[in-house]
């Protein structure tokens, strides 16, 4: 699948990840892709959409954070490897169905 951009926001705690996701989805025309949990309770939320929508969603969180934001970034035109990593994570967590790429 091809994505215009990825938006990544890292927070501490699953509840905060849900709140940040909700804010981004309500702010712009973006779609939730996956989330990634790390040591110490850090959660990174991934959204996708066109570059302007993803930028608006991430900027809204940075300008009016509902909680402490550890990191926020926009990756425009993500590489095939970045897409593969994000989609594998989404499949692992059940947010995306696995597809058979073998022919």
Where are the language model's segments positioned?
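RNA-recognition motif
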Residues: 34-40
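Short amphipathic alpha-helix segments
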Residues: 14-28
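Helix N-cap motif at beta-to-alpha junctions
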Residues: 48-54
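Short, low-order "capping/linker" segments at domain edges
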Residues: 81-100
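A common structural junction motif
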Residues: 28-31, 62-70
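Short glycine-/aliphatic-rich beta-strand segments at the starts of folded cytosolic domains
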Residues: 1-12
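Metallocofactor- and cofactor-centric catalytic cores in central/energy metabolism, strongly enriched
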Residues: 41-46, 72-82
């Amino acid at each position: 699948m091809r994505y215009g951009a990825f938006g990544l926001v890292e927070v501490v705690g699953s509840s905060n990840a849900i709140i940040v996701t909700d804010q981004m989805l309500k702010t712009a025309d973006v779609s939730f892709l996956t989330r990634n949990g790390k040591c110490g309770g850090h959660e990174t939320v991934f959204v996708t959409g066109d570059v302007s929508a993803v930028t608006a969603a991430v900027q809204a969180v940075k300008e009016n954070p509902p909680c402490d934001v550890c990191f926020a970034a926009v990756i425009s035109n993500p590489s095939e490897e970045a897409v593969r990593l994000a989609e594998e994570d989404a499949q692992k967590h059940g947010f995306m169905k696995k597809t058979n790429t073998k022919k």
